[in-house]
């Protein structure tokens, strides 16, 4: 599954386009976020991507999960959003 990392500065429209492309190509994708701002951008991107995919009859579902990552030598808690067609 391809992992798309989302930051608080990510453009939701750009993330949505990438997300829709990965799902069309590979069937599923994962958004990885650290922090509330990044999670906010990821959820907006998911809503936009759902709109991109709806005309072709594809609905998206999201399964959130916590995960621990090592960033610059420090352990951080991240939220993963596993996205797949319904």
Positions of the model-derived regions?
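C-terminal edge-of-domain segments
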Residues: 54-86
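Short, hydrophobic/π-rich interface segment
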Residues: 36-60
């Amino acid at each position: 599954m391809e992992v798309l990392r989302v930051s608080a500065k990510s453009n939701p429209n750009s993330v949505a386009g990438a997300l829709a492309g990965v799902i069309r190509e590979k069937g599923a994708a994962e958004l990885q976020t650290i922090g509330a701002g990044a999670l906010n951008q990821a959820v907006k991107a998911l809503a936009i991507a759902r709109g991109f995919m709806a005309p072709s009859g594809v609905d998206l579902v999201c399964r959130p999960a916590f995960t621990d990552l090592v960033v610059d030598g420090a352990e951080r808690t991240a939220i993963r959003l596993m996205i797949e067609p319904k």
